[in-house]
UniProtKB/Swiss-Prot annotation:
Entry's Gene Ontology BP terms: translation
Single GO MF annotation: structural constituent of ribosome
Quaternary structure and interacting proteins, as annotated: Part of the 30S ribosomal subunit.
One Pfam assignment: Ribosomal_S10
Keyword annotations: Ribonucleoprotein, Ribosomal protein
GO cellular component terms given for this protein: ribonucleoprotein complex; ribosome
PANTHER family per record: 30S RIBOSOMAL PROTEIN S10 FAMILY MEMBER
Top-level taxon in the UniProt lineage: Bacteria
Protein name per Swiss-Prot or TrEMBL: Small ribosomal subunit protein uS10
Record keyword Phosphoprotein present: no
Length: 102
């Protein structure tokens, strides 16, 4: 291939599904003969939401909700056409966002 590296960035709310998706990608890339660097765990993004429990008053009574976004980075070095075709046909679990840069 003309490009020397494919960078795959994965995002998910559950780290177990994210790790299984990363494992599938690494296994597919190594099976087709490419060199893989990763998965590298990136910092977890944490969103915190504070909501008043009561509808009209009692501002001191609040509830907090948290949403965590886990991220992984995988680099595929020297991919072949066979590697790209296998990655296009790969079935990943739902709930995993995949960003690919060539």
């Amino acid at each position: 291939m003309a490009n020397k590296k494919i960078r795959i960035r994965l995002k998910a709310y559950e780290h177990r599904t994210l790790d299984t998706a990363a494992e599938k990608i690494v296994e597919t890339a190594t099976r087709t003969g490419a060199t893989v660097a990763g998965p590298v765990p990136l910092p977890t993004e944490r969103s915190l939401y504070t909501i008043i429990r009561a509808t009209h008053k009692y501002k001191d009574s609040r509830e907090q909700f948290e949403m965590r976004t886990h991220k992984r980075l995988i680099d595929i070095i020297n991919p072949t056409q066979k590697t790209v075709d296998a990655l296009m046909k790969l079935d990943l679990p739902s709930g995993v966002n995949v960003e690919i840069k060539l």
